[in-house]
Amino acid sequence: MSEKNAYAKSGVDVEAGYEVVERIKKHVARTERAGVMGVLGGFGGMFDLSQTGVKEPVLVSGTDGVGTKLMLAIKYDKHDTIGQDCVAMCVNDIIAAGAEPLYFLDYIATGKNNPVKLEEVVSGVAEGCVQAGVALIGGETAEMPGMYGEDDYDLAGFAVGVAEKSQLIDGSKVKEGDILLGLASSGIHSNGYSLVRRVFADYTGKELLPELEGKQLKDVLLEPTRIYVRAALPLIKEELVNGIGHITGGGFIENVPRMFADDLTAEIDEDKVPVLPIFKALEKYGDIKHEEMFEIFNMGVGLMLAVSPENVNRVKELLDEPVYEIGRIIKKADDSVVIK
């Protein structure tokens, strides 16, 4: 019995793994940017930091996955956007620290290599990288029979960015009187899906719920996470923002206080939050308390900016999109976030 046959009998298809690598090369090529060194398939991805032109570079890194949103991608057999979610979750955290994302690596684990499906996943990763301006410089695809079912897979990513030391955003610049500006989310993004799946467990995904304005439920649930790099980076370069919050798991209540020091409070005007239809549907069909929605979901705001009043107009000028003035920073109240 040859070694190849022995491995195949264990459930690992080496040839399928080679096919995956060949299929994804064209997608990886789309993401190339200045600073990339080496070629796909080496033992390590390489990047020349001197190409960024940053004088006092500070590296900022982030890693994340997409949680149980993957289970809906598998359920609905749609795999070409979930990779964008993975990239977004990493690079949005990096931009919140005032850094420009540079490169990304992905990790896919599956019970059985399906080259067509995995190419779809990586195509979404590449699309996310293009939107974020980062290079996909490496990754790993692990076939793990016995660990995962044949149709199952998990996806995680890792990103690295660079910031000028003087432009780092760590919450220390946010002050009383700052205006809170919200940038719209594209949907649920990639958090809260254990609850989402419970609420819609008995739905096929093809439903046209009245709250969803003519869209099929599955399309709304799998809407990819918005990537905010292109919107936020010019603001960082001009030093127009004092704080940035990526509104992910834990919603407003957990993420907004991460923007500023403990002696401040964010006062949010709920009427100015652009709540998306899917959140109204979740609250209704899931019988979720209204205040709890803000503890779980982004509610329509995926990125929040703390901006000095004198810079608000310039920020709006640079952002070619609706910008929502949803609150302000005040002296410390009983809670770190007050929604009124």
Swiss-Prot record:
One Gene Ontology cellular component term attached to this UniProt record is: cytosol
Q: What class of enzyme is it?
A: ligase
Subcellular localization: Cytoplasm
Assigned keywords, A-Z: ATP-binding, Cytoplasm, Ligase, Nucleotide-binding, Purine biosynthesis
- Which pathway is this protein assigned to? Purine metabolism; IMP biosynthesis via de novo pathway; 5-amino-1-(5-phospho-D-ribosyl)imidazole from N(2)-formyl-N(1)-(5-phospho-D-ribosyl)glycinamide: step 2/2
Q: Which InterPro entries match?
A: PurM-like_C_dom, PurM-like_C_sf, PurM-like_N, PurM-like_N_sf, PurM_cligase
The protein's GO terms of the molecular function aspect are: ATP binding; phosphoribosylamine-glycine ligase activity; phosphoribosylformylglycinamidine cyclo-ligase activity
Reactions that this protein is recorded to catalyse: 2-formamido-N(1)-(5-O-phospho-beta-D-ribosyl)acetamidine + ATP = 5-amino-1-(5-phospho-beta-D-ribosyl)imidazole + ADP + phosphate + H(+)
Q: Which family does it belong to?
A: Belongs to the AIR synthase family.
Protein name (record): Phosphoribosylformylglycinamidine cyclo-ligase
Q: Which organism is it from?
A: Streptococcus pyogenes serotype M2 (strain MGAS10270)
Phylogenetic placement of the source organism: Bacteria, Bacillati, Bacillota, Bacilli, Lactobacillales
Supply the gene name.
purM
